[in-house]
């Protein structure tokens, strides 16, 4: 089975398994922000996707980085 086939996801939920270092950083960010761990992940993922909408296109990355006044204000 090829992993390069892109299929639509059946839903809008994601399960993440984090390594200890990443989890520790996320817990620290959660404490500093006062958000739940889930909301902290959501804010950070949205921000990343807005900053880097086309991760494999360097021109889009530069444009996205200029437009990042950002999602954190929206929440």
Swiss-Prot record:
One of its GO terms (molecular function) is DNA binding. GO terms for cellular component: cytoplasm. Keywords: Activator, Conjugation, Cytoplasm, DNA-binding, Plasmid, Transcription, Transcription regulation. Coiled coil: none annotated. The keyword Amino-acid biosynthesis does not apply. Pfam families: TraY (PF05509). It is found in: Cytoplasm. InterPro entries: TraY. The keyword Plastid does not apply. Belongs to the TraY family. Conjugative DNA transfer (CDT) is the unidirectional transfer of ssDNA plasmid from a donor to a recipient cell. It is the central mechanism by which antibiotic resistance and virulence factors are propagated in bacterial populations. Part of the relaxosome, which facilitates a site- and strand-specific cut in the origin of transfer by TraI, at the nic site. Relaxosome formation requires binding of IHF and TraY to the oriT region, which then facilitates binding of TraI. Also positively regulates tra gene expression. Part of the relaxosome, a complex composed of plasmid encoded TraI, TraM, TraY and host-encoded IHF bound to the F plasmid origin of transfer (oriT). Interacts with TraM, probably through its C-terminus. This is Relaxosome protein TraY. It comes from Escherichia coli.
């Amino acid at each position: 089975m090829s992993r390069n086939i892109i299929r639509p996801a059946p839903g809008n939920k994601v399960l993440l398994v984090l390594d200890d270092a990443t989890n520790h950083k996320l817990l620290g960010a959660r404490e500093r922000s006062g958000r739940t761990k889930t909301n902290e992940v959501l804010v950070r993922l949205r921000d990343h996707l807005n900053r880097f909408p086309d991760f494999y296109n360097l021109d889009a990355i530069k444009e996205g980085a200029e437009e990042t006044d950002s999602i954190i204000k929206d929440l």
